[in-house]
Amino acid sequence: IIDVVEMPTMTEGKKNKKQVNGSQIFNEISVRIKKFDKKDIRVIIEQVSAMPGQGVTSMFNFGQSFGILKGICSAMQLPMYFVRPAKWKKYFNLINSEKDASRTRAIEIFPYFSSELSRKKDSNKADAILIARFYHETYKMND
C-alpha cells in the first residue's frame, strides 16, 4: 500500500450533487505509480453490487463511480482485481460488525496510517486499506 486518499469528487448540476471526478482520479493514480514498473502494480477494487433498500438514483450513481474507476484503470492498462465484500470482511472478522470496526482493524494492522484514519468518516479509507491487505495476503501468492 503506497498511499490512501479520499475518492476525488466534484459537484455537478443545480443541486450540487457530488460525483466522482474521473480526471482527478487519473491524476492521483498517475502521480503515485510513475516510479513503479507497471508489472508490479495491482489495482484492487471492491466488487460491489446493488444493496437492498438502495434507491434507483443511488444505485445508478454507485455503478457510475465503479465504471469510472474501471474505465480509468483500463485506459491506463493497469491490472485490476476484484474482491467481494463478504470475502475480505470474513477474513478480518468484520461480518455483522459496526461500520467503524474496519477503521479500528486497519489502524491495528497499519499504525502508520492512524492519522489518515482519525475520523469516523474515514471508515471507507479503512475499508480500502483492508481490501488491499486481503488481496496481498490471499491472492498475491497466485500471481
Q: Where are the regions that the model predicts?
A:
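Phosphate- and other anionic-substrate recognition elements at nucleic-acid/protein interfaces
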Residues: I1-D143
